[in-house]
Amino acid sequence: MENDKLSPTSLAFIALTNEYCQLVENCGDHGREGMVEALIKLLPRIYITVTDLEPNLEYLDAFISQALDEASYDVVRDNLSALMGEDDAYLEVFLDDMKYSDTPIATSISENLADLYQEFYNLLVSLRDLNTEEQRQILGMCKENFVEYWGQTLCNVLRALHSLSVANRDYYDNY
């Protein structure tokens, strides 16, 4: 009977991705400093939890649907960009292209956060109405996507958010 349930780690990961999606969808309610602070606390928890997920390489029948359309993605990215303002852009150092470039490569916090939102939104939509085994397969695919793509995105944007948080003079007043 225990095999009919997701592991506590899987449930925690789903809850954290849902929390992330809600945070991003309501980013205007937090202000920039509040949003940065919330993300700095949430993103490492997502990272740790996904690394603890059991790998599931048997996902022949499962797939993560591409539920988030381009217009919705653009709204999320634009809202985050407006919130981050002039601090949205940062220099990327972990792109393969950077190895061969003398020119810095810029990216944006808003685009990275929107990319994560898209991954998590699609995951959550895909998990709905599936049986436990299919959910395990979807989570296995998500973990593989973490290794291949969005794990680095999460780390990169966390680095940029950390830089913003410590640059804020009020940050040290809280300690």
Regions found by a protein language model. Give the residues of each.
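Acidic, proline/glycine-rich low-complexity IDRs
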Residues: 104, 119-175
